[in-house]
Amino acid sequence: MNTVSVVQFLAVGCAVFVLYGRGVFAAEGVKKAGQHKDAELCLGSDGLGHRLDEFWYNDDMCQRFLCFKDDEGIMYEQIANCPIAIAEGDCTLKPGTKGHYPDCCPAVECPPEDQKEEEI
């Protein structure tokens, strides 16, 4: 698989979309976390308390979560989702493996550039 580099950032509301080469778009969102009965824990969108700065996962939805505090002490939950993968031309869509984000995400796989030149 070719290495892709970030070429553009586009911020919309609280979500950040990153455009990668070869039709891969990633999305990441941040929302204010709920207050847990234990003030040292963040109330995640799963309804459970989580320690600050530790990741937890939803493997069924292929998501990664993280709670953090801003400079004012407000807790936020960061949610990382799989990129939107679009296979164009000679590229194919390869399903992700089972397990935690990002390994469970689909990927766009393209033939190496030198292989394309040989076919011409």
Swiss-Prot record:
A Gene Ontology molecular function term for this protein is: toxin activity
Q: What is its main location?
A: secreted
Q: Which InterPro entries is this protein grouped with?
A: SVWC_dom
Alphabetically ordered keywords of this record: Disulfide bond, Secreted, Signal, Toxin
**Which GO terms of the cellular component aspect does the record hold?**
extracellular region
- Has UniProt tagged this entry with the keyword Nucleus? no
Q: How is it modified after translation?
A: Contains 4 disulfide bonds.
Concerning Pfam families, the annotation shows: SVWC
Q: Where is the signal peptide?
A: 1-26
Tissue spec: Expressed by the venom gland.
Localization, per the record, is: Secreted
Family named by the database record: Belongs to the scoloptoxin-16 family.
Q: What protein does this entry describe?
A: U-scoloptoxin(16)-Er2a
Species name: Ethmostigmus rubripes (Giant centipede)
